[in-house]
Structure formats: C-alpha cells, structure tokens
C-alpha cells in the first residue's frame, strides 16, 4: 500500500517464512508472476551496547556475529542449526501426508504415511525422540540446553512465539519454532520477500485459479 506519495510498503505481513515447494511447482506460481527472493541478512537483534547480532543465511557468518556476545554460543551455533533443521524435517514430512479417514484407517491410508520414513531413516529413532521432546518444550527449556547470552536466547526464542498469541514460557512453543524452520535448509530466521509486495502473492494465486477455470466472486452474498 502507498502510505505516502511515492512510498509503498507491506502494511501487515511483510515476509514469507516458507511455501511448500510442491505448491509452487504444482500451481506453476512462477509462470504466473510470482518472484520470491531471499536476502543474505535475515534478522538483526539489537543490543544496547551496540554488540548487535546479525543473522545471515550463512551460519558461519551468524556465528561470527554471535561471538560479540558469547564465544561459547558462537561455537555451538552451527550445531544448533543442524539440530533444529533435523527436527523440522519430521514436520515437513508430516505436512506431506493426506490425513487418514479416521477411525477407519486402512492399508491405503498407512501407505500415504510412507513419507515419514525419510526423516526417520536419516535421523534414526533418536531423532524422532528428539523431535517429540523439542516439540513439547517451552523456549527457556530449549535455550538452557544451548545458549548463555540473553540476547541470543531472546532472538532465538522469538522464532518460537512468531505468529502465535503465546509467550516463550508457554508449553509446545518448541513445536512452533520447528514449524517456522520447515523448508529452511538450516537457515535460522529464514525469510523471503515477494517482489511487488505481499499483495502480489494474492494476485498470483488468483491468476492461477482463474487459469484453471475458477470464477472469483467478490461482494457476493453468502447464505449460511
């Protein structure tokens, strides 16, 4: 939206965390004008003493920035990224599953759940146990296992409460953190921008639907 003559910005939501690659491919969103780009610098955590932490797509560059706050935290940062990415793979596979017809679950329904085997083979049963454990955690519990710097802990915990009406001490904010990291390839706080603004995403989806024969009606009366 134009908030001043010649100046436009996204007024509500300004970035995309992730879109399922299958959706982009199946709907041919790129052919209908969707242009997504990913910045190198994804987040900045400000510090009163000017020891700001910059989060980059490259975890090693992020670690170098974290070192201004804590050498210990900087050292474990790459391992933390890999750990969270491994847990988020279970969610990514879960999101690929068509929900079974409960309570009548047959062999066909079980076959659709085969995508869950991929992260299980890659990370083992210990990885599945870690996923269940992290998903149930609140942010301070997870932070206690990894970081000492308050700024690092706060910046990472922000991902656990993003887009939900809960605080970091709420149970299962670990699940939300993992959800935010799906399809992020070990890039913590990963974000994408839509060229032309977030409204362009809605326009692209509309064009895609119309190209498939959908008629979009607005200001139409709906009977409940």
Where are the predicted features?
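Short loop/edge segments at beta-strand edges and connector loops
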Residues: 38, 218-220
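Active-site/ligand-binding neighborhood in enzyme catalytic cores
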Residues: 85-212, 219
